[in-house]
From Swiss-Prot:
The keyword Protein transport belongs to this UniProt entry's keyword annotation: yes
Source organism (scientific name): Gallus gallus
Function noted in UniProt: ESCRT-III-like protein required to recruit the ESCRT-III complex to the nuclear envelope (NE) during late anaphase. Together with SPAST, the ESCRT-III complex promotes NE sealing and mitotic spindle disassembly during late anaphase. Recruited to the reforming NE during anaphase by LEMD2. Plays a role in the endosomal sorting pathway.
Record's protein name: Charged multivesicular body protein 7
Family per record: Belongs to the SNF7 family.
One GO CC annotation: ESCRT III complex
Length: 448
């Protein structure tokens, strides 16, 4: 039985259907009828019906957010008043022809992946009972149970998984466990089958590569949005093993820390109950646990130091490669440039600038005599403006007289009186504060 996803396979909500779905019975009867054997009989009706169902099928997949579907699921989803569309098989065949949809088995076969062998059990693929003749024979419709994939939606969700990884803490390492990645993508992938399809799409785009190591599958991502992933090598496997060691050591340290805290609580309880020997044993156990924690911390620091050095060396290699590329580009760009050519070019530019200045001066001198103004007339006009300015009275606001002192001055006596009031208030507050109890607390002489 086809099970494309977890979304409910029931009829589409009314808001996702066209207006004529409930109002125009005559048109819906036409749309629910089967396609003619040949488009040439009436191409206009054929194209109108095909456009209607193609849009609905693609919109339904995007609304439900699942990348897989089948003919039976679509028939149930588009059921109307007990009737199912009779031409959906032809519509799916057309979508397959256009490349909007693809058979799940064909998609898997198109990916050159060595890990599909262990993924077959997850996909639960049935024997390929259908053949090309059964699909493209007289009926020209796919099998009802055959799973189809929305190609564009699969690509978009695969890109979403890649961005999700890049924005997570897992991206600090080039290699990640498949189980950790599955947990990270739980919100994007409704089921495990979809998750593996998205990984296949990413591998098809050369953004991930997957390897099985000691019974556990690990995933390596490309280090960049447009970069291609490199094959898994010994360094990647070594880094993954170090990461696993770091994780195990961290978990062990956390567990021992909780154990040490429990020993401390037990010692405190025994101390309050007057069981001194039991309290001492609990403290000894706490000390032993703390020594084990210190040993694990030293090992954890060593592992983290190695990882830091590996990441630093990878960064140094990237910088070195960038320097090499920059030097090569600079050499190529400076291939035909010499000092002599540069000096010759500068001389030519200087000569052209001098020539341009001479031409500009020549052109400017042609109209100087006609436009030159008499300097004496300009001086007379300036004197006239100065005389007019001297005759205008200047209105200034009166300057306020400054008093020898300000009205709000405070004398020293007033300040001393205010200070005395503050001192009295502080003394009253100090008398009202209760004194701390000085009674000694009795307990066993254990340092907890």
């Amino acid at each position: 039985m086809c099970s494309p996803g977890r979304a409910p396979p029931g009829p589409a909500p009314a808001g996702d259907l066209p207006p004529e779905w409930e109002t125009d019975d005559e048109r819906m009867a036409f749309l629910f009828s089967a396609f003619k054997q040949s488009r040439e009989v009436n191409s206009t009706e054929w194209d109108s019906k095909m456009a209607f169902w193609v849009g609905l099928v693609l919109a339904r997949g995007r609304r439900r957010g699942v990348v897989r579907t089948c003919l039976r699921e679509l028939q149930n989803g588009f059921e109307r008043r007990g009737s199912v569309p009779l031409g959906l098989g032809t519509v799916l065949r057309e979508l397959l022809r256009r490349g909007k949809m693809q058979r799940e088995s064909d998609f898997m076969a198109s990916v050159d992946s060595s890990w599909i062998s262990w993924g077959v059990g997850v996909f639960i693929l049935k024997p390929l009972k259908w053949t090309l003749s059964s699909v493209l024979g007289d009926s020209k419709v796919p099998e009802e149970e055959e799973v189809l994939i929305y190609v564009e939606l699969l690509q978009e969700k695969a890109e979403e998984v890649y961005r999700l990884y890049q924005n997570s803490v897992l991206s600090s390492h080039p290699v990640v466990a498949l189980s950790e990645l599955r947990s990270l993508c739980a919100g994007v992938c409704p089921d495990e089958r979809t998750f593996y399809l998205l990984l296949l799409q990413l591998q098809k785009e050369k953004k991930v590569t997957i390897l099985e190591q000691n019974g556990e599958k690990i995933v390596k991502f490309a280090r960049g949005l447009h970069a291609k992933v490199s094959p898994m090598n010994d360094v990647d496997i070594g880094v993954y093993q170090l990461m696993q060691s770091e994780q195990l050591l961290s978990q062990k340290v956390e567990s021992l820390s909780q154990e040490a805290e429990k020993c401390k609580d037990d010692a405190r309880s025994a101390c309050r109950a007057g069981k001194k020997q039991l309290a001492l044993r609990c403290l000894k156990s706490k000390r032993r646990t703390e020594r084990r924690i210190e040993e694990l911390h030293s090992k954890l620091d060593a592992v983290q130091g190695i990882l830091d050095r590996i990441y630093a060396s990878q960064t140094d290699q990237m910088v070195f490669n960038a320097y090499q590329a920059g030097v090569g580009a600079l050499k190529l760009s400076m291939k035909d440039v010499t000092v002599e050519k540069a000096e010759n070019l500068v001389d030519q530019i200087q000569e052209l600038c001098d020539t341009q200045d001479e031409v500009a001066q020549t052109l400017a001198g042609a109209g100087v005599n006609g436009l030159e103004m008499d300097s004496e007339e300009l001086e007379k006009e300036l004197d006239s403006l100065l005389q007019d300015s001297a005759k205008e009275p200047v209105h200034l606001h009166p300057v306020p007289q400054k008093d020898s002192g300000f009205a709000g001055a405070i004398s020293d006596a007033e300040l001393e009186a205010e200070l005395e009031k503050l001192s009295v208030c502080d003394g009253d507050l100090a008398q009202k504060t209760p004194s701390a109890s000085s009674e000694p607390q009795t307990a066993l002489g254990l340092n907890l």
